[in-house]
Structures are given as structure tokens and as C-alpha cells.
Amino acid sequence: MIAMLTVLLYLGLILEPRTAVQAGHLPKPIIWAEPGSVIAAYTSVITWCQGSWEAQYYHLYKEKSVNPWDTQVPLETRNKAKFNIPSMTTSYAGIYKCYYESAAGFSEHSDAMELVMTGAYENPSLSVYPSSNVTSGVSISFSCSSSIVFGRFILIQEGKHGLSWTLDSQHQANQPSYATFVLDAVTPNHNGTFRCYGYFRNEPQVWSKPSNSLDLMISETKDQSSTPTEDGLETYQKILIGVLVSFLLLFFLLLFLILIGYQYGHKKKANASVKNTQSENNAELNSWNPQNEDPQGIVYAQVKPSRLQKDTACKETQDVTYAQLCIRTQEQNNS
């Protein structure tokens, strides 16, 4: 009887916090690992759990564990806590969740985070067909093989995209285990470094050493799209700007030539008007020469008064008398 009560009490202590967590109404926290969730053996890693400002304790829960794996008080910011793993080993590999508690109760569990340890086994070999340098739209295949009979292989793209593919291993007589990853219609998003790992089914978070790296370079096809690329648009804009500038320069040059021609014509017309005025105001000297000249002829004079106009700036005028001489012979007079 005492033993039964002890068992029931033990189960109550275990189930009570889990029931409170499951029934929690506080927002669930966020969990992540630094420097990442795939950690080489014997290196340190920090697991972070970020929740509410009212949190009093943060609990880290590992899958297949009965009690919280670790409990930490919040940092000075009070909205998160960190859990240190000084040296990564197989015992730390697994799936983790976190939650927090406050005066209002327990929060929900965070999303699951898989913490993987690499380096437990020898590395597999990675190859690519037909080439690591292909054009966009081509299908390629990665082959990951190992002398160790792994249960599965995983292909990982390192970098910002962080894509991964997992396949069950296949077996042949001369090749104990391998997996072929086919990527259909690759795009520039697949550019990057690829590695593969092997692991056993019963320990999915304990991987082998990383394979050799392969750098994949995907280039655009020449006729991939009828729309201009960014470089094409930039070139088109430069050409358009150049044409517009040329038209503006021609327009201003033509306008300048028109103004010059107009000023030249106006000046020429003004000069002609001045000459005509001077011709009308000046007296003309008319002479008449008879056909038969006689040294003894009589000279007649015809006087025509006129006024010489000087510059308009001068107000005084002078009278000038012009004489027109007419020479006639005596013989003409007698007649």
C-alpha cells in the first residue's frame, strides 16, 4: 500500500508541471541555437529561449526526458535565458523545446529544435553529375556514398538558403551504401556549397563527419526570358538619355542659329535705311556735257541751295551752296 502511494505521488509530481504547461495560456517562447543547430563534436553551443518580460524561470525540455533537462533564471533583460553546452557529445544530441513560468502560470512549449552532433563516423564521398557548372533549368544529381552501411544520407546546402534533402540509403555489392539526390531544373538559388552526411536510423541526430564540399555554379541561359534583365534596362535607359540630350543640344543649336540670322538681317536692313536717307538728303551734282566742246564757250552756273545735315547729335546746321556749271559755246547762243 505504501509502495502504491509512493508511485502515485511520483506520477503526480511528474504530470503536474506537464499538465500546467499543456494548459498554459501564455504565448509560447522562441528557441534557437548559436552558432547553429548542427554542431561538430566537442565544440560548445548555446541554446536560447526567449519569452515574456514577466517570466521568472525558463525550462529546457529534451525529447524522451521526463523532467526538464535544465532550468535557468532570466538574464538582465528578463525576456530570455541561455543554456550552455560546453562540449557537444552524443548525449546532448536530440530534439529540444523550451517554456517559461511566471506568476500567471506556465507558457506553451516552443517549436521543436533539432540539435545535431557531427563527426561520430567517417565522412562519406560526394560527387555531382554532369557538372558543378551548369546553366539554369538543367537537372543534376548528387551522389553521396560511404563504405559504412548508413541507414540514411542527408544533403545540405550551406549558406543563406539552407536547403536540405534526406534519402534512405541504397546498397550494392561493390558499394555498401549510397544515395542519389536529383535536383530538377536548377536555378541560381541553388548556387552555393554542398556537403552530405550519413547517419543511422536509431540515432538521427548523430551524424558522420561532413563529406568533401562541392561548389555549385548555376548560370542564366541566354534566351531564358524575353523581358530585359536589369543590366539591359540600365543600358536602355542610358541610350534613351543620350538620345534626349542630343535632341536638346540640336534644338538649342538651331535656336542659336535662328537668332544669329535674325540679328544679321535686322542689322543689314538698318544699314540700308541709313544709306537711303543719306542719298535723299545729299545734293546731287548734275552735269551736262555738250558734244561739241569749245574753249571759248560761255559758262553758265545754276545754283541750288541745300542744307548739309551732320550727325543727329549736332544741333547746329550750316547752309551750303552747290553750283552746277553748264558750258555753252557762242555759236549755240547765236542760233
UniProtKB/Swiss-Prot annotation:
Which InterPro entries does the annotation name? Ig-like_dom, Ig-like_dom_sf, Ig-like_fold, Ig-like_Receptors_ImmuneReg
Annotated motif ITIM motif 1, positions: 298-303
Residues exposed to the Extracellular side: 24-238
Q: What happens when the gene is disrupted?
A: No effect on fertility or litter size. Normal development of mast cells and natural killer cells. Increased severity of local and systemic anaphylactic reactions. Significantly increased sensitivity to IgE-dependent passive cutaneous anaphylaxis with greater tissue swelling and mast cell degranulation, and significantly greater and faster death rate in active systemic anaphylaxis. However, another study found no effect on mast cell activity with no increase in mast cell degranulation.
UniProt keyword Repeat, yes or no = yes
- Tissues in which the protein is found: Expressed on mast cells and natural killer cells (at protein level). Expressed on neutrophils (at protein level). Expressed on eosinophils (at protein level). Expressed on dendritic cells (at protein level). Expressed on memory and marginal zone B cells (at protein level). Expressed on CD8 T cells (at protein level). Expressed in the uterus of pregnant mice where it is detected at day 4.0 of pregnancy with levels dropping at day 4.5. Highly expressed in the luminal epithelium of uterine endometrium with lower levels in the glandular epithelium.
* Major subcellular location class: membrane
Where are the annotated coiled coils located? none
Task: Identify the GO cellular component terms for this protein.
Answer: cell surface; external side of plasma membrane
Please name the GO terms that the record assigns under molecular function.
fibronectin binding; integrin binding; phosphatase binding; protein phosphatase binding
Q: Kindly state the subunit structure of this protein.
A: Interacts (when tyrosine phosphorylated) with SH2 domain-containing phosphatases PTPN6/SHP-1 and PTPN11/SHP-2; interaction with PTPN6 enhances inhibition of mast cell activation.
Name of this protein: Leukocyte immunoglobulin-like receptor subfamily B member 4A
